[in-house]
A protein has these predicted regions:
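A short helix->loop->beta-strand "cap" motif at the edges of active sites that frequently abuts
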Residues: 116-121
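N-terminal cationic-hydrophobic initiation segments that often serve targeting/anchoring roles
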Residues: 71-72, 109, 113-114, 163
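General small-molecule cofactor/ligand-binding pocket signal
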Residues: 51, 122, 169-171
Length: 200
């Protein structure tokens, strides 16, 4: 983990010392960190206590390494997880990236279920990128080259099956987020990956 991620993790560890356990949790990478869930929920009359433990740039290996401060220490009754977008890359595992992701999803669910017996688990589907925005550069397109609709369809099919196998839930909100070519709608994103509040 880089220094920025380490700092966020340290802050979460401090916050977990005073957290009210047994509440609702959203956790994962940037799409969770940038999710203004508490504000949106309050605007809809939802007064539940909701915690956010997302860290931008986090991958699944890092999430598993720090699963206690990011999830288990809070002992949530409901947990919503969106992690793995940063694993859609050939950098570390080559053409085995999808296999590695699915193995990690199983590990995450197994660790939660082994410790939090009554927690309801919701896996949130991966959202496609938009590689056709005017702001895209050769470097950004290269970085996102695997984040195409076909790969997201593959990346979401197996987790849905895994979730069912483990008695968990799978949430796919992409129908309202994608355009005619199954890329992220331009009005919802500022860089082709991360979302404006209107998308949430």
């Amino acid at each position: 983990m880089d220094e920025i991620k380490e700092t966020k993790l340290k802050n979460y560890q401090y916050l977990n010392e005073v957290v009210i356990k047994g509440e609702m949790l959203f956790t994962g990478s940037s799409l969770m960190e940038l999710f203004y869930i508490y504000e949106i929920a309050r605007s809809r009359g939802i007064d539940d206590i909701i915690y956010n433990r997302g860290i931008s740039g986090l991958n699944m290996d890092e999430f598993l390494q720090h699963i206690y401060p990011l999830l288990l220490d809070l002992r949530p009754t409901k947990v919503f997880i969106n992690i793995g977008t940063n694993d859609i890359t050939e950098e570390t595992y080559g053409d085995q990236w999808l296999h590695h992701m699915m193995a990690n999803i199983r590990q995450i669910l197994e660790q939660i279920l082994a410790i939090l017996l009554n927690t309801k688990i919701y896996l949130i589907a991966f959202s496609p990128a938009n590689l056709h925005l005017p702001c895209q550069t050769r470097a950004s397109i290269q970085w996102m080259k695997l984040r195409i609709p076909e790969n997201f369809d593959r990346s979401n099919k197996t987790p849905e099956e895994i979730a069912k196998t483990y008695g968990c839930h799978f949430i796919n909100c992409n129908a309202e987020l994608v355009d005619d070519i199954k890329e992220q709608k331009a009005e919802h994103t500022y860089d082709g990956v991360h979302l404006y509040a209107n998308a949430y």
